[in-house]
Amino acid sequence: MIPGIFLSLPDLRCSLLLLVTWVFTPVTAEIISLDTENIDDILNNADVALVNFYADWCRFSQMLHPIFEEASNVIKEEYPNANQVVFARVDCDQHSDIAQRYRISKYPTLKLFRNGMMMKREYRGQRSVKALADYIRQQKSDPIQELHDLAEITTPDRSKRNIIGYFEQKDSENYRVFERVANILHDDCAFLAAFGVVSKPERYSGDNIVYKPPGHSAPDMVYLGSMTNFDGTYNWIQDKCVPLVREITFENGEELTEEGLPFLILFHMKEDTESLEIFQNEVARQLISEKGTINFLHADCDKFRHPLLHIQKTPADCPVIAIDSFRHMYVFGDFRDVLIPGKLKQFVFDLHSGKLHREFHHGPDPTDTAPGEEVQDVASSPPESSFQKLAPSEYRYTLLRDRDEL
């Protein structure tokens, strides 16, 4: 008989305890602290990175720390490979240069990176373990819908901006570039792809990418650049996915106000697409050079009744054009005047020159008075900004500075 090895009862209990502890101890993910030495290397090598820009003295940052760490633990179990998902943090007091690099204006700020590229939209959702984990799962999901039938190609949802890629095979550099762009812009466009036999009728000149704009009247547009050139492909698709005139909603209002640019807004009824099309065309014709100085937006009159009341309007008055400078609101006048060449452009120029603000307080400038007409100093008070209320809240963030307003 072969002698066995027997453990004493205390030793057996200890071994079982260690085994149970080993089996049931959850994976603990490390929150990587970023500094000037490691930030580029870590972010560039991460498929997805969620970075918490914080300050220790900020109470909202203190409240987020344990939630952020627990969310990291949850995600680490689902994506165990080192570079699949990275949770990282930056102490903005210790590394003010990094905070300035990413224009951090409030604590905490949660920014998403893909392969080192910062995404335009930061995380603004609920600060809970579940919400953060769900957000990362969404970011890791496939942003491209694969088409399996020609009927799907010919009948996409035309209420959306559709980017459709036609490829001979999925395992190709053309598709990898397309997929990389889709990961970045999937919030702005619907991305679809077809391969092989399904896509063959659309590949008469090789792999290609087609933009199908909303509606049924606008023609499709084909990308004519190199499909292996990421910058060229990204710039072309971004131009199609992010319109010159964007819709403002309660969901994206905080993001738009934080861009810091005044709003030129068309208030219109949702079903009134004609006024929106006129406004879009005139903005493109008259104001394309002002793209970096003002945000061009349109808003649903029914949803934004309160801002309309601020300028003594109701949905029955729509369409209405106004400027919100984050200090005051100014009304354009008769919507039909937008078709007068240069009229809309002058309205925006008068904002930048201070004329709108000046005339609201002191009446028309002397140069605008007809010859022989008596000049009267008619003081008035323009309505206060309504959209500044959508800006980041002091009940959710520590705001670092007040925006200089017009």
From Swiss-Prot:
Q: Which InterPro entries match?
A: ERP44 (IPR052643), ERp44_PDI_b (IPR041870), Thioredoxin-like_sf (IPR036249), Thioredoxin_domain (IPR013766)
Bias type Polar residues, positions? 378-387
Q: List the disulfide bonds.
A: 189-241, 301-318
Which cellular component terms (GO) are annotated to the entry? endoplasmic reticulum lumen; endoplasmic reticulum membrane; endoplasmic reticulum-Golgi intermediate compartment
Note the superkingdom of the native organism.
Answer: Eukaryota
Keyword Plastid (UniProt): no
**Keywords of the record:** Chaperone, Disulfide bond, Endoplasmic reticulum, Signal
Task: Locate the motif Prevents secretion from ER.
Answer: 403-406
* Described purpose of this protein according to its UniProt entry: Mediates thiol-dependent retention in the early secretory pathway, forming mixed disulfides with substrate proteins through its conserved CRFS motif. Inhibits the calcium channel activity of ITPR1. May have a role in the control of oxidative protein folding in the endoplasmic reticulum. Required to retain ERO1A and ERO1B in the endoplasmic reticulum.
Assembly behavior: Forms mixed disulfides with both ERO1A and ERO1B and cargo folding intermediates; the interactions with ERO1A and ERO1B result in their retention in the endoplasmic reticulum. Directly interacts with ITPR1 in a pH-, redox state- and calcium-dependent manner, but not with ITPR2 or ITPR3. The strength of this interaction inversely correlates with calcium concentration.
Tell me what this protein is called.
Endoplasmic reticulum resident protein 44
| Organism encoding this protein | Bos taurus (Bovine)
